[in-house]
Amino acid sequence: FKRAKGRIQMGGRIVVFGSYVTDLTGRGTRFPVPGETVLGASFQMGPGGKGSNQAVAAFRAGGDVTLVTKLGRDAFGRAARDFYTAEGMNTGEWIEDETCETGAALIMVNQQSGQNMIMVLNGACSHITPEDVRAKQTLIEQADVLLVQMEINVGALEHVIRIAHESGVRVILNPAPVQKLADEMMAMVDTVTPNETEAAALTGVEVVDLNPPTARRRYF
């Protein structure tokens, strides 16, 4: 795992409650067809997951960032801690579960076309319990901004959003990968950051241009 050099400082306490997975990326000249084995050109292992990626990006931009995620007590979990320690980031709020494995993303990249195929195995991030969330309630309540995604189980996501909303914390939702949230929960979100596909899935309104349609503005 490698880290980038340099960061700036800025104010505001940011809590990212989301996923960490280890990215396992293989590159080759073509994808195998079902039942076929092909030789690849290169392999890379590194930190990933939408929650982790956004936490690292915000930290490198100068934010006061704490990531809350769940990992297994395994080699991938230890590698994650090593990476975050090298970044200078806080890992004290991470949840460990020896009964679960750390999540992983299996990524194949076609070097000729640039296309990829990805299978995400969320592992421990799919097993965040109500007790896990309650243990982080004070941390969430004291944040200025809560950033969440949809790579954790929906029950935990809704619990986290409700705590933040009731505490007056600004909630930003990156709705990826899209899962159904009750309208009541969407009303507790201050900012939603969908791409075109995610916006259409959430609203039922097809994206025909990149200017925000009136119907979508009304929804959000």
Predicted regions and their residues:
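Glycine-rich phosphate/adenosyl-contacting loop at the front of the ribokinase-like
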Residues: 4-71, 75-89
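Beta-strand->loop->alpha-helix junctions that form or flank phosphate-binding loops
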Residues: 42, 68-73, 91-102, 174-176
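Alpha-helical segments flanking ligand/cofactor-binding loops in enzyme cores
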Residues: 56, 81-82, 158, 162, ...
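Active-site-proximal loop->helix
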Residues: 75-87, 107-109, 114, 118, ...
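Short gly/ser/thr-rich secondary-structure transition/capping motifs
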Residues: 88, 126-131, 171-177
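Conserved phosphate-binding/catalytic loop of the ribokinase/pfkB sugar-kinase fold
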Residues: 92-97, 107-145
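Conserved phosphate/ATP/ADP-binding segment of small-molecule kinases
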Residues: 161-220
